[in-house]
Amino acid sequence: MAPKKLTDYERKRLDNIKRNAEVLASLKIHSTLNDLSSSAKSQRAKTKSYKVSPKKKVKGESPIVIRRSLRSRGIKPDELSAGGLKDDYTETPNKKAKTIGSSPNKKVKTVDSSRELGPISMRDVYVGKESEDRKFVETMLNVSKGSRDSGGDGLEGGCEGKEIKGLDTMSLEEGNVARVVPGRILSVRVFPSVDRRMVVVGNKFGNVGFWNVDCVDESDGIYVYQPHSSPVSGIVVQPFSTFKMFTCCYDGFIRLMDVEKEMFDLAYSGADSIYSIAQRADDVNSLYFSEGRGELNIWDGRTGKPSSSWGLHETRINSIHFNACNTNMMATSSSDGTACIWDLRKVVADKAEALNTVNHERAVHAAYFSPSGSILATTSLDDSIKLLTGANYENVSKIHHNNQTGRWISSFKGIWGWDDSHVFIGNMKRGVDVISTAEKRCIDTLVSPEITAIPCRFDVHPHKFGMLAGATSGGQVYLWTSSC
């Protein structure tokens, strides 16, 4: 077959290709390109690296854990956690020097709050000017003298033994509000003086603060000491020697403030926390205090050491109280969910059996006898107040009350007024609920625009109707009074 004849265009194209090839050959372009290409490939081969991933370790398969409660597994809960979180628990502050003041305008000094195994001078632990400490000592001695002269028995106005009415006459005046100490208040007491209004509080930092409500000079009437290095859990004022006062703390110390000696004497020291203290009205030489896991000790002031120790509860005792008409009858409340009534004449070291026990679903923060001793009121974290009546306190009435204060507010503790008619307890709406024992319900709430925080701990003046002190977790104290 004859070859196909090329067109003019194809012949011209082939001639151009041939001519270009000759030009490139004369310039040695192809050899140069080949050399460069070979060099580049060689360089890439030398520098190219590969990241080798390490072999992954084969993890063993973790078993799937199904969380089940102790109750569903039939296991008894730990006694330390059975009552929930510890009431008023707070970490002990560092035992180093720290500056604490009761008000922004008050000059303060640094106080060493370390544990002193011995007496402490009031002057050394005073938070403020030394001249103010001297003034407080003089004030306290005058308060004590007034208490001894008045006798301190019964209510003013001949109201003793009668039902006290007129709660609507109670009011909170603007001048009866003060920030006494910094931080949360755990304990509050009104001095049993008929001629002077004095309130003492203890806070979580180990401060003991005094408020002279009737102070009229340039001072604010507030005096703060730091005899302890941990939360002050209890205060007992001697009824006929108000210049003497016991305080206890979570660090296991009990101190006796003696204003005449101007000292905080060390009455007792132990390894366990002390949660509450109390004293019988007819025995000023003995002090009852709860320590550690349900232990109740009796401190003898004549020997300066404990004389008896009883294991009454499974875990901490939150309150101790005596029947005013029969001081052999004692009531205790505990985080184990019970409140018990004891006859001290029948309690022995190896066998402590309660006369009566009332059970709650959660921790019981308080159990107090009424002024006549015929009713026992308990306050529990299970949102209830129980009233025990009858010859053997066998009749139990339950009143619902919201007692959930949360972590930052001290637990509510219902206290008695000046007769058996009412129980006073704080609420979460910045008021004070009044519980009627006759109607078994809240019949009134004390409110005031002066209340800026939740009052949670209370005490009443034993001889003045209508005088109620309420303390907050911010260091404030409110003092209600009656116009009648």
PLM segments and residue spans:
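Conserved strand-to-loop turn within each blade of WD40 beta-propeller repeats
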Residues: 202-205, 248-251, 290-293, 333-336, ...
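Canonical WD40 repeat/beta-propeller blade segments in eukaryotic WD-repeat proteins
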Residues: 183-190, 230-237, 272-280, 315-322, ...
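Loop/turn segments within WD40 beta-propeller blades
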Residues: 189-196, 236-242, 248, 278-284, ...
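Intrinsically disordered terminal extensions that flank WD40 beta-propeller domains
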Residues: 2-185, 484
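Per-blade loop-tip surfaces of WD-repeat and WD-like beta-propellers in eukaryotic adaptors/scaffolds
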Residues: 169-171, 207-223, 240-242, 249-276, ...
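Beta-strand-rich domains and repeat architectures in extracellular enzymes and scaffolds
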Residues: 177-206
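Loop/turn-rich, solvent-exposed surfaces of beta-rich toroidal or solenoidal domains
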Residues: 370-375, 379-387, 394, 402-437
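C-terminal interaction modules of eukaryotic adaptor/scaffold proteins
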Residues: 432-484
